[in-house]
Design a protein with these regions (language model features):
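Bacterial N-terminal signal peptides that target proteins for export
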Residues: 1-8
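Bacterial N-terminal signal peptides
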Residues: 8-15
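Residues in and immediately flanking transmembrane alpha helices
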Residues: 15-16, 117
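N-terminal signal peptide c-region/cleavage motif recognized by signal peptidases
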Residues: 17-22
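Sequence context surrounding c-type heme c attachment/ligation sites in exported
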Residues: 24-60, 64-156
Length: 156
């Protein structure tokens, strides 16, 4: 539990420091903050994906830590990251976020809720072995992919 508290405090400090730093280094601060948040997701998902695929030796403690990191990230308010006027229609190549994300018919909040539920499930089984990890990771990937497919411009 102490590791989780230290990790939570560290992630919060990193987010605040990163957002403060981003504000003074060119580009839109909201876009920089959301990219940093997504990089933290990607880093932890990469560790878990490697274990689930057998590319990296499964380690229960490392899997639990990465899954708990993801769970902690879902508790950080992203409201300021997704400010209106920060899509690729307004900011061009600075972001791949499509304008539909802010549309009245956007399902992004629903997908985000599904992702949170999938991450909670993942965190509850990450230490239970490679097979359990892989099965739970699929739900997270499905939610991430749904949002990216609908609201992120494909890479060139």
């Amino acid at each position: 539990m102490n590791k989780f508290i230290v990790l939570t405090v560290s992630l919060a400090a990193l987010a605040v420091t990163g957002a403060s730093w981003a504000g003074g280094h060119g580009g839109n601060p909201a876009v920089k903050a959301r990219k940093a948040h997504m990089q933290l997701y990607a880093y932890n998902l990469g560790k878990l994906g490697g274990m689930a695929k057998g590319e990296v030796e499964y380690n229960a403690e490392a899997a639990e830590t990465a899954a708990n990191n993801l769970a902690t990230l879902t508790t950080v308010s992203q409201a300021g990251y997704w400010a209106p006027g920060t899509s690729n229609a307004e900011l061009g190549e600075e972001t791949r976020a499509l304008p539909g994300l802010w549309g009245a018919d956007s399902t992004a909040m629903q997908i985000g809720g599904e992702m949170g539920e999938a991450i909670t499930q993942l965190a509850s089984v990450a230490g239970d072995g490679q097979e359990a990890l892989g099965a739970a990771l699929g739900g997270v990937g499905k939610a991430c992919g749904a949002c990216h497919k609908a609201y992120r411009q494909p890479a060139n």
